[in-house]
Design a protein with these regions (language model features):
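Short, Lys/Arg- and Gly-enriched loop/turn segments at beta-strand edges
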Residues: 70-80, 170-173
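Short, compositionally biased
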Residues: 75-92
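TerminUS-proximal long segments
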Residues: 147, 156-201
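Intrinsically disordered, low-complexity linker/loop segments enriched in Gly/Pro
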Residues: 1-57
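A hydrophobic, small-residue-rich beta->alpha segment in the mid-to-C-terminal subdomain
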Residues: 110-162
């Protein structure tokens, strides 16, 4: 099944009776791997790719590992709107132009996976197959961020994460062997783990 979805006056016309405001986002964003080959389609990798995260949106900062000279940043797959989790394996795709600024941050702890920074949150991206591995990876990255990068006591990090760090499904493209014909049966996933910036002040 295919359907053309009109976008009119900053609204997405989902059905004859339902229109919603546009919420633009970038589905694919990543850098090049140090070895081997990568794909901006699927799955996602530690250096990014087709993560389909709604937080990769205007005003946010995406932090990516850099493994090669020049980074070779790739951006695409623009969406007019997408629900978190992308349950049908497709968003409301749209043509457009992404205006971004790029900074190289040196002399920091290496990133194990992408992170997204908003005005209010640090968002840690978990990648893995099965999905439990994705969740574990996201938790471990957040824990390292608090303990290694910010000098927290380990016990304090556990307590704050248990109380305030929310987790959710990001997109279904974390599988190492995705089945496009059965998107709702994805065996791996991208997960996101949210830490309020207020805990760092």
């Amino acid at each position: 099944m295919a359907r053309r979805i009109p976008i009119r006056s900053d609204e997405v016309v989902l059905t004859d009776t339902l229109s919603v405001p546009v919420r633009p986002m970038i589905g694919c964003i990543g850098t090049a791997p140090a070895q081997g080959t990568g794909s901006t389609i699927m799955p996602s990798y530690s250096f990014g790719g087709n993560m389909d995260l709604t937080d990769a949106a205007p005003g946010s900062t995406v932090h990516l590992p850099v493994e090669v000279d020049g980074a070779l940043l790739s951006i695409g797959d623009l969406h007019a709107i997408m629900a978190r989790g992308e349950s049908s394996f497709v968003a409301i795709e749209a043509q457009g132009t992404a205006i971004v600024s790029v900074d190289l941050i040196k002399n920091t702890s290496p990133l194990r996976a992408p992170r997204i920074e908003t005005d209010r949150e640090w968002i840690f991206v978990g990648l893995g197959d099965p999905v439990q591995d994705s969740i574990t990876a996201g938790y471990e990255d957040m824990f390292d961020f608090l303990v290694r990068d910010h000098g927290w006591n380990r016990d304090d990090a556990y307590v704050v994460m248990s109380a305030l760090a929310h987790s959710e499904l990001g997109g279904p493209t974390g599988s190492t062997d995705p089945d496009p014909l059965h998107p709702m049966a994805a065996v791996g996933a991208v997960t996101v783990h949210r830490l309020p910036k207020s805990v760092l002040t």
